[in-house]
């Protein structure tokens, strides 16, 4: 089976590099990805995709990108097993390559 996702969009927030208790770098953010099609008489719709980067990828993203930057992400879609505080299901791109 194949689980490969490629996304291109703009980073929607300021990036923050965090470190876990075991010393691993991590950052999480969302990107705004416009849909390819627009129904006649309607505005283009945008999807907001949550991304998590670990280790050197996290450090690279925080060093060279910022809010509003266009970024391409390749990885695997992984569904999370919890709900956010607002009750929505969360999804993220795991094992991402920037």
Where are these regions (language model features)?
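Single-stranded nucleic acid-binding surfaces, predominantly the OB-fold ssDNA-binding core
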Residues: 1-97
């Amino acid at each position: 089976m194949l689980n490969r996702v490629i996304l291109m969009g703009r980073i929607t927030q300021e990036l923050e590099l965090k470190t876990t208790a075991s010393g691993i770098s991590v950052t999480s953010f969302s990107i705004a990805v416009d849909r390819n099609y627009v129904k006649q008489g309607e505005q283009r719709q945008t999807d907001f995709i949550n991304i998590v980067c670990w280790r050197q990828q996290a450090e690279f993203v925080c060093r060279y990108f910022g809010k509003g930057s266009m970024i391409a992400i390749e990885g695997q879609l992984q569904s999370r097993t919890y709900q956010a505080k607002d009750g929505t299901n969360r999804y993220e791109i795991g094992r991402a390559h920037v």
